[in-house]
Amino acid sequence: MQATPPPVTATLVPETQPQAEHRIGIRLVNDQAEFFDKHSGEKFTPRGANYVFVPENGAFTNTPLRVGTYDPQLTRQVFSHLKGLGYNSVRVFLDSCSRGPNCIANVTKPGLNPAYLDNIADMMLAAREAGIYILFTSNDLPDDGGYSAEANLGSGGDFAGYRNSFYLRPQAISATRRYWRDILTGLVERNAAFEVVLGWQLLNEQWMFRDQPPLSLTNGLVETTTGSYDMGDPQQKQKMVSDGIIYYIAQMKAEILRHDPTALVTMGFFVPELVAPDWYVETSSLLEKSDLDFFDFHAYPGDLSLQAHVEAFGMLGYTAKPIILGEYGAFRHLYAERDTAARVITNWVADSCELGFDGWLYWSYYPANAWIGDRTWGLVDGNDDFLELFSPHNQPDICVPVEIPHANLAYNKPVRASRSLPDEPARFAVDDDPVTQWGAGDAPVQWIAIDLEGSYRITEIRLLVAQWPAGKTVHRVQVRYAGAEGFATVHEFSGMTGDQDWLVFAPPEALENVIEIRIQTISSPSWVAWKEIQVKGESAP
């Protein structure tokens, strides 16, 4: 008797759906590149935030996609909240969690962590549900999964490991292509919502080490993916990096388009002189020659002006491809007061419009932890203060600064001085920006005077010191009353002062009918300068 075969058990295999076309594209309008919505035909302006920190155990973590940390409900709440205020984009790091069993790559074998890919796919679904677009960025090759190990094979000697190898050597190109291939095929298998991807960012910030080989070499020939270069020739060394990065971009873009044919590809850059002079970045040749669809430049208010950033990037007058300001924000150690930070941010963005930027992603939605030295104001600090203030609903045109209420009677008032350096004009003392300063460019005696453009009852005068070296100083606070010919001295500061000190004069009784303030420095070991002069009070009756 023939045995009856066991019943066949059907195995359910998820059906892979046709891949959706990316909704955001790029077009040229009157020789000016711009993003646009392929469905509506309307111009698209990226406005949103870096979604890089999330709450965890009473603090914040920078691994929002980590298995065990990723919160589908929180992600949907945040994306919906952003959309409700008119924002349309977020920037998310794919691999800030790069080492460990709950991170992007497998620990014990090559490839990526399936559970982590599930989280990426769910975030894309959340974005589709909310109507938000995601710019996914890679910080680096993961430590696990075999990617970094392959990229570093054969490094040493003419090539230091890590970044100086990652962008110039064939093993690294192969490893990085495999990384992007694994990400994209994994998301295709999960029927991910590719249409919500604004772009794939090859690197959060591209840079190399000046003080490591091959950039540190002063002689000899070096072989890279793009040829042989003489390290004794600075121009060949620069060409080596430019050629190498252009080739790297072309290779990664080709890999991405194999699996995601309508994708946009970008890369992030910053000006290294701000934080790391030994890091090398050059973008002018990439603007001209690379296959990137758009560029992401990062610039924060501080010691370096936005104009200086733009000149360093080589983007003045550039219109061939869109450029977004993918990171900007106000550092709390520089801008400790909320209103000052808000004013600096809104003016920084307005200036960026004039200099050629086409999109804006604030750093960051949630703040970094309080112990992080260079943290910025988060959009949700306070009671979502900046999130609402800078939202498209409150500020439809990001190029028009938001009006920030202030109590400083000296803010942006006419000012004159005994003398001023060309790059430290007197107006910098009343711009409500503690990073800029008026500088006389000479020793005492020097003065600066502010026309209040009205008659006021003055209750407080505050001076933010710009001084090096520290030492004993004498400063006279003088006022001119309505109807008076000259100035009257109402207070004298005398004592030890140093840079960033605040000198505060609060008269026992308000000074009535004041129309002008003058600060006269009598003695100082430093050239005379002030970062800020603030005047508090009210209109005279």
Residue ranges and their predicted role:
Residues D501-I515:
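Short, surface-exposed tryptophan/glycine-enriched loops
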Residues E485-E492:
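Surface-exposed loop/edge segments in extracytoplasmic proteins
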Residues I519-S526:
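Short beta-strand-plus-loop segments that form exposed binding edges in beta-rich domains
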Residues G471-A484:
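Short, surface-exposed beta-strand/strand-loop-strand elements in extracellular ectodomains
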Residues M1-Q19, P541:
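Ser/Thr-rich, Proline-interspersed low-complexity disordered segments
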Residues P401-S455, L464-T473, E492-D499, E532-P541:
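Disordered, acidic Ser/Thr/Pro-rich linker "stalks" and the adjacent N-terminal cap
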Residues R343, N347, D351-N408:
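Aromatic-rich peripheral "rim/lid" segments of glycoside hydrolase catalytic domains that contact
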Residues R23-L292, P301-L304, Y328, R332-E337, ...:
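Active-site mouth of glycoside hydrolases
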